[in-house]
């Protein structure tokens, strides 16, 4: 097409304006073409507004720069490219889907390597592998980046860069929950750990599967912190599966000290048979044998349901197997046996008859059940006074509160209090004891005890031992009602070493009967450790 002469005259300035806006590389190419004798054709006259837009695209301004047009700002306010002085905030790192990157210059808004990697978590941008996570029908497709995964996990390294590297672009992982897998990936991308009670066990499994020890340790710490009687048996089963000895030890501490609560929990019925056998064999379970027997029956009923079997005595015996003969039935009292196990129908008539004879006959029959009573746990006592005394008209229980605060340096289980009784002979007291943490009542008991007039303390127990965490102050209180004068403690100590546990004491504002650190009542704390 021949060149229009007008382009060399009236429109030459417009062509020059456009030329000045071109990148240097393009200018050089035009100069090179001119040097070879080629004439550059002006194919289109570009409007000024479009030139401005093209210039903005070719030379993007920095985040703190405005391109101003002094002649057209007012008229083109809605259409001109507006650059903000303040950079938009970076996406939140906890967002589980980062497929919302709008800026082509997103790297500028994330100055650290961790932030930039975190932005790639669960992001399709540059993803070079996808995981189909979860069982069929409940799976989720998760994008990922091989390099980041391989840097954080030796399993992923072998999967992507080892001698038998995976070549498929989609990898199926049916044995890991999607939520747990996302928590694992989030840690590998950003070092962030977001654990919840509902997913922590599944996350521990994923961390173990892909050998990410730091995440596994965080899961174990989370479980130890949230451990209590209602979930201790389930966690014991899982700790054995995951081979976590520290968690196993913590589970046993709770199960031993709070055995009745643990055995009566719903979680106990969810454990596997080997874990059931280990628990029932335990020598240090701190509970009565009829509680153990009832728990075993509850487990058998739940197992029948899991296996789709009718709940009958025969099926219960079958699912229990030898576990039934681990219960120490002969160590029950005769009354406990007669009102419980003897009427359960799970024992044969011959077994029931033999056990009754074992209780009553001089010539006792042979039994298949263990005969030796469990040892349980030996309670320990922390004495906070160095001496005790009594004086006429000195100390009297009149229904007012004696209270003290304490803290320990390791986790224990408070079982009860040791209290002073009458200094004037035999006397009966009604007593209410209470344990609180930050004003919240954790346990209380209302009972009576009889004092014989000596200076020894008398034990008053909570219904169940209460777990007490370290480095936190708790308040114990006792309200006694009686007419007689009582003994009281002197030379109180602010710190007491009791075995491996260190107690610290301080005065309580709840105390209205004179008890404090230096003297008064509540001389003993009874605990398991």
Curated annotation (Swiss-Prot):
Protein's organism: Xenopus laevis (African clawed frog)
Listed A to Z, the keywords are: Cytoplasm
Q: Which GO terms describe its cellular component?
A: cytosol
State what protein this is by name: BTB/POZ domain-containing protein 6
Q: What InterPro entries does its record include?
A: BACK (IPR011705), BTB/POZ_dom (IPR000210), BTB_POZ_BTBD6 (IPR049738), PHR (IPR012983), PHR_sf (IPR038648), SKP1/BTB/POZ_sf (IPR011333)
Gene3D superfamilies hit by this protein: 1.25.40.420, PHR domain, Potassium Channel Kv1.1, Chain A
**Phenotypic effect of disruption:** Embryos show strong defects in late neuronal markers and strongly reduced and disorganized axons while early neural development is unaffected. Muscle development is also affected.
Q: Where in the cell is it found?
A: Cytoplasm
């Amino acid at each position: 097409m021949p060149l229009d002469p007008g382009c060399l005259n009236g429109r030459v300035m417009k062509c020059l304006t456009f030329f000045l806006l071109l990148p240097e590389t393009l200018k050089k190419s035009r100069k090179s073409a001119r040097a070879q004798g080629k004439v550059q054709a002006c194919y289109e006259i570009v409007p000024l507004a479009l030139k401005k837009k093209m210039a903005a695209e070719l030379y993007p301004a920095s985040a703190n720069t405005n391109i101003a047009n002094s002649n057209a700002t007012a008229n083109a306010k809605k259409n001109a490219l507006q650059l903000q002085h303040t950079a938009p905030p970076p996406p939140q790192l906890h967002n589980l889907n980062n497929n919302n990157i709008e800026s082509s210059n997103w790297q500028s808004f994330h100055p650290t390597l961790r932030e930039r990697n975190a932005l790639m978590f669960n992001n399709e941008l540059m993803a070079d592998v996808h995981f189909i996570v979860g069982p069929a029908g409940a799976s989720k497709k998760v994008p990922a980046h091989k390099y980041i995964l391989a840097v954080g996990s030796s399993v992923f390294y072998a999967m992507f860069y080892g001698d038998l590297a995976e070549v498929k672009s989609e990898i199926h992982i049916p044995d890991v929950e999607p939520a747990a897998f996302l928590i694992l990936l989030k840690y590998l991308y950003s070092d962030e750990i977001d654990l919840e009670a509902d997913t922590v066990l599944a996350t521990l499994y994923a961390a173990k599967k892909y050998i990410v020890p730091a995440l596994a340790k965080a899961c174990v710490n989370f479980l130890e912190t949230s451990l209590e009687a209602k979930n201790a048996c389930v966690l014991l089963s899982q700790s054995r599966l995951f081979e976590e000895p520290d968690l196993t030890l913590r589970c046993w501490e709770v199960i031993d000290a709070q055995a009745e609560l643990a055995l009566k929990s719903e979680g106990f019925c969810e454990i596997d048979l080997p874990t059931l056998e280990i628990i029932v064999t335990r020598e240090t379970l701190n509970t009565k044998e009829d509680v153990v027997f009832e728990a075993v029956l509850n487990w058998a009923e739940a197992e029948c349901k899991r296996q789709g079997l009718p709940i009958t005595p025969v099926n219960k015996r079958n699912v229990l197997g030898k576990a039934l003969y681990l219960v120490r039935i002969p160590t029950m009292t005769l009354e406990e046996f007669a009102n419980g196990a003897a009427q359960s129908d799970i024992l044969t008539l011959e077994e029931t008859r033999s056990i009754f004879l074992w209780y009553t006959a001089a010539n006792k029959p042979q039994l298949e059940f263990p005969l030796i009573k469990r040892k349980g746990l030996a309670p320990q006592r922390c004495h906070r006074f160095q001496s005790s005394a009594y004086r006429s008209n000195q100390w009297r229980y009149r229904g007012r509160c004696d209270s003290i605060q304490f803290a320990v340096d390791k986790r224990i289980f408070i079982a009860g209090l040791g209290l002073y009784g009458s200094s004037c002979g035999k006397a009966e007291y009604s007593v209410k004891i209470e344990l609180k943490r930050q004003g919240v009542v954790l346990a209380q008991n209302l009972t009576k005890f009889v004092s014989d007039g000596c200076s020894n303390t008398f034990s008053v127990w909570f219904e169940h031992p209460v777990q007490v965490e370290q480095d936190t102050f708790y308040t114990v209180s006792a309200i006694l009602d009686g007419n007689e004068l009582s003994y009281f403690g002197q030379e109180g100590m602010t710190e007491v070493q009791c075995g491996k546990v260190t107690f610290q004491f301080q005065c309580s504002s709840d105390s209205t009967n004179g008890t404090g650190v230096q003297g008064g009542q509540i001389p003993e704390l009874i605990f398991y450790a």
